[in-house]
Amino acid sequence: MRPAVSVITPFAGADAELDALIGRLEALRAGPEDDLLVADNRPRPAPGRRGPVEIVAAAGLRSPAFARNAGARRARGAWLVFVDADTAPRADLLDAYFTPPPDDDAGILGGGIRDVVDRPTRVARYVVDREKLDPRHALGHPHRPFFQTANCAVRRSAFEQVGGFAEAARAAEDADLCWRLQDAGWRLEERPEAAVEHRARETLGALLRQLAVHGAGVAWLNRRYPGSDPGPSLRQLAGRLSWYPRTAWSRARRGEREEALFVLIDLLALSAYDAGRLRSNDARR
């Protein structure tokens, strides 16, 4: 028997998106001791129950971290499973997280994340090709590994021990939580079979806005954990402006037109990410 879990999803979208999210959560194979929670982070939340899904009011700071903490306070389970609103979990997600049972010192379990194309735009194909949310990127972080809150499970006692998410953070709260858990003696365990599909961004504007938010998050992390991600040097920035256009031109001359475009998007993506480092990551501002 696996432990009781609480599935928590932060939400800040439109009503139609909420309907679709509830449908995806209803498809999970959940037991009678599990609860399915949507933490409604909109300015005017709509708390209540929709079938097996409870919508929890999470008005206040506009940040996923704030919403997840609000959901965690309502949760009953021994484990808190966090999935994002733009993901589609596999029906067996909850069972897969606990097969095999986690070790006693495992504080957080990281599931699989696969980008998928909803509308086959060039940008969506780029995101899938570059595997932007592949968990290997987070696990290979030069400071310390972490799991992404797009899909992870946290032991409730460990979560409460470290005080939950830094709820004023707009981004990078997942790395911060994982690093505080490791500082407290908890281990990370991978659960790649506990998988979700993540809907790839479909437009260049949406992708660049997302990356700018992530850039603000890593700059915030670097202030909290000095040296964890100091950003590129001026020499590295200058090198990009030369290498990426030359590489794109070379690919185009060989007839690899889509890959040439992808290389140019790489440059724009890096630029948005680095520009985002200049922005505040504080939802109170």
Where are the language model's segments positioned?
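A conserved acidic beta->alpha catalytic loop
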Residues: 38-48, 87
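Short, flexible, basic/aromatic active-site loop/helix in glycosyltransferases
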Residues: 112-113, 127-144
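Short aromatic/hydrophobic "clamp" motif used to bind/position activated sugar donors
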Residues: 80
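Conserved donor NDP-sugar-binding/catalytic core segment of glycosyltransferases
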Residues: 92-122
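Non-catalytic, C-terminal membrane-associated alpha-helical segments of glycosyltransferases
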Residues: 212-216, 228-285
